[in-house]
Swiss-Prot record:
A Pfam short name: Glu_cys_ligase
Ligase as UniProt keyword: yes
GO cellular component, one term: cytosol
UniProt-listed InterPro entries: Gln_synth/guanido_kin_cat_dom, Glu_cys_ligase, Glut_cys_ligase
The organism of origin for this protein: Clostridium acetobutylicum (strain ATCC 824 / DSM 792 / JCM 1419 / IAM 19013 / LMG 5710 / NBRC 13948 / NRRL B-527 / VKM B-1787 / 2291 / W)
EC number(s) recorded for this UniProt protein: 6.3.2.2
Pathway listed: Sulfur metabolism; glutathione biosynthesis; glutathione from L-cysteine and L-glutamate: step 1/2
Keywords in alphabetical order: ATP-binding, Glutathione biosynthesis, Ligase, Nucleotide-binding
HAMAP family the record matches: Glu_cys_ligase
Swiss-Prot/TrEMBL GO biological process terms: glutathione biosynthetic process
Reactions catalysed according to its record: L-cysteine + L-glutamate + ATP = gamma-L-glutamyl-L-cysteine + ADP + phosphate + H(+)
Family the entry assigns: Belongs to the glutamate--cysteine ligase type 1 family. Type 1 subfamily.
Protein name: Glutamate--cysteine ligase
A GO molecular-function annotation: ATP binding
Length: 481
């Protein structure tokens, strides 16, 4: 949008207006594998006590039959979301018999590839589509990669705040056009600066040896296409913050030809549709049917829009007969889904209230900051900074790329620039807040920028080293807590 950070700060400068910045709808989806008391992936069916996967809006499965997904409804505050997620988490824990919820994003001890159970669905048209889609994911990427779990954080600003900006800035567009452009503007800045969330909240610096085959395969690919990169990336076992969001976790390298730049809804729709309609030599060679059974939906770059992996996605509640993409095109962006958060093992529900408060400050900052279009060159730097923060974030000498020129900047210095504005936003949001919870969340996270010891990724490695514990032993201690 065509506004500046100082202009937006002035616009929300009084207490009544600033209170709107913390209002909206918020929700969390948490994925977690079920494990037995030895730390092995549970191979049992999804517990029947949770009912039909299609019918239960709070507890379902993700890729695997062993992978539970807990979903809160949209609520009005971080505190309400936390309570709702805690209630669901307790319900699941109490229902599990001889099993626990794995507290980490990277998988527990995995069986052989063929023994990992894909989620099972009823023999209905919708059920068959979901089943074939998941079988296709297993065929394309391997089941082990699909066993990674995370936190999806959903949010939207309040109608009151959106109306206020629309009126005050006298936007010469329809309300719907303005809302779409507002969320796309925020998203472009989120992409530019989300590396700092990977650094601060990354909690998957290590994995079990049963996942190593995925890492070795990716390292081989890197050595072939980028030999000079391989040496640096091999240091991931010393410096990683989040294997989950790195090349060793979810990756969209096969989709690069149709990179989505998030510059408009039309471009977003066109690029994703193109990937859904363009045949992939790699995937089509795998076949669509095997022994008379359909093994993937199609041989295209994307089987469906759900396969589009991105740090952030646009969402709309769908009506009968709609897909997520057609709902967006028909009625516009309703809310945003942040997808780069690792499960926090140091909080019983996988994400803390403080994290959610910080995310709200960060999202407002991304909204306020000027947001020009992203081009191919800038997207390349965005993706590079993402990978550097994920694989080498704990290297105190790490340099990131700036976006306005070809220069590089120390991670800490780049972070200081961001936190300078986050403090201003948090102070504004705390004007009518006695607790000063937004400023406190910013100061708490700022300490991590200059003290690696405070990072969750570093804490995981330190606790494992100090107590000479394996990855599985560490995970089981927090699973049983």
């Amino acid at each position: 949008m065509h506004w500046s950070f100082p202009e937006m700060i002035r616009l929300f400068s009084d207490e009544y207006r600033s209170s709107m910045l913390s209002e909206g709808n918020f929700g969390v989806e948490r994925e977690s594998q079920r494990v037995n008391y030895s730390g092995d992936l549970a191979l049992t069916p999804h517990p029947s006590v949770f009912g039909d996967k299609f019918e239960n809006p709070r507890i379902t499965t993700d890729f695997s039959e062993s992978q539970i997904e807990m979903i809160t409804p949209p609520l009005k505050s971080a505190e309400e979301v936390y309570k709702a997620l805690n209630d669901i988490n307790n319900e699941v824990k109490n229902a599990l018999k001889g099993e626990l919820l794995w507290p980490l994003s990277m998988p527990p001890r995995l069986p052989k590839e063929e023994d990992i159970p894909v989620a099972q669905f009823p023999d209905t048209e919708d059920g068959r589509q979901k089943q074939i889609y998941r079988n296709g994911l297993a065929l394309r990427y391997g089941k082990k990669m699909q066993m990674i779990s995370g936190i999806h954080y959903n949010f939207s600003f309040s109608d009151k705040m959106i109306d206020f900006i629309y009126r005050q800035l006298r936007i010469e567009k329809t309300k719907r056009q303005f809302i779409d452009e507002m969320y796309f503007s925020l998203t472009r800045n989120f992409l530019r600066y989300h590396w700092i969330l990977i650094y601060l909240f990354g909690a998957s610096p290590i994995c079990d040896s049963t996942y190593n085959s995925v890492i070795f395969k990716e390292l081989e690919k890197i050595e072939k296409c980028c030999p000079h990169c391989a040496g640096k990336i091999k240091n991931f076992n010393r410096y990683a913050t989040s294997l989950r969001v790195s090349r060793f976790g979810y990756s969209d390298t096969d989709e690069k030809k149709y990179t989505v730049y998030f510059n408009s809804l039309r471009e977003y729709e066109t690029k994703i549709k193109k990937m859904m309609e363009t045949e992939s030599n790699k995937y089509s060679k795998l076949g669509i049917y095997k022994d008379g059974v359909q093994i993937q939906l199609n041989g295209n770059l994307l089987q469906s829009e759900s396969e589009f992996y991105a740090p952030i996605r646009f969402k709309r509640n769908i009506k009968k007969g709609e897909t997520q993409l057609t709902a967006l095109v028909n009625r516009g962006v309703e809310y945003i889904e942040i997808r780069i958060l690792d499960v926090n093992p140091f909080d019983k529900v996988g994400i803390s209230v403080e994290q959610m408060n910080f995310l709200q400050v960060f999202n407002v900052f991304c909204l306020f900051e000027e947001s020009k279009s992203i081009d191919e060159e800038q997207m390349e730097r965005i993706n590079t900074n993402h990978q550097l923060a994920a694989l080498l974030g704990r290297n105190e000498d790490l340099m990131l790329y700036k976006y306005n020129d070809d220069s590089r900047i120390p991670l800490k210095n780049f972070g200081d620039e961001i936190f300078e504005k986050l403090r201003i936003v948090a102070k504004l949001m705390d004007k009518d807040n006695v607790e000063k919870k937004y400023s406190e969340s910013v100061e708490s996270e700022y300490k991590k920028l200059h003290n690696i010891e405070l990072l969750p990724s570093e804490r995981i490695c330190r606790e494992m080293d100090n107590d000479n514990r394996s990855y599985i032993q560490f995970g089981m201690e927090y699973a049983e807590a």
